[in-house]
Amino acid sequence: ASGFPPIAGIWTAVVGGIICSRLSNSQLTIKGPAAGLIVIVAGAVVELGTEFGANLPDAERAFLGYRLALGIGLAAGVLQVLLGAFRGGRLTELFPLTPIHGMLASIGVIIIAKQSYEVIGVAAPKGAGPLSLLAGLPGAVSQMNPEIAIIGGVSLLILFGLPLLPIPGIKKVPVQLVVLAVAIFMGMAFNLEHQHTYLFSSQFFRSGQAASFEVGPRFLVEMPEVLKAPASAFALPDFRGLGCMTGLKFLFLFTVIGSIESLLSAKAIELLDPWRRKTSFDRDLMAVGAANVLSSALGGLPMISEIVRSKANIDSGAK
């Protein structure tokens, strides 16, 4: 959804877990990639890629935009370190929670609009905005790929239904891992690893006539062959974006939105801490900034203190 490759999220999680846990005194917050920055990161990839590689093929332009966004992310990390050093943690006292909640809600709508097409196995219209994507969903449902839709539907049912079951200790089971295990098993059962065509008969498709659908590796997440080609797991930042207004715009957004959301998440988790420990928000901001510098240098996504994972951390008994 952000325009970054999947391996970028892994780098962010690894760097956040190692660096921030040593530098920050926020005991319970989980640092990593978050939905709150998806729209900004995706915008940076698209706009910077278009500005510096308008004549390139789509794949090359997207990769260039990715590298340019890494340069912006690294510079934003440096600014976050400086903000923390100059007592920028006081930003938590200046911004009310309501606009942040509104921003997060809008981001949720955008993610739903984009990923609903993926869940049912239909290609989303390129360049369409969230409202256009939502308006096109009814038509997309009539063209859905049944096997992919079954995997998506079962995964959502487990994700939202499993925690509601009245079974002792069920909430301590990481439901995301259950979803992942079930989805992998279903993907193997449907033989998604190999390109093939299957028939599906239903009143929903073509007036009850059996319809043919294609499935194959394109429905699987593409991961780089790290062991065969270690260099493919990394990407170097491109700093040319810092010399244009588009790049400076996203530098401001990366720094301010990332810092505010991270600080507010840390503040919320401080209130939930069963031991009532106090967090140094300046120190936490410096830790996030330092981790963002390293993450961007490796090819990772920008990170923040993530409220959902941090709350799950507390619910799982973290101290």
Question: Could you tell me what each predicted segment is?
Answer:
Residues A1-K319:
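Transmembrane helical cores of multi-pass ion-transport proteins
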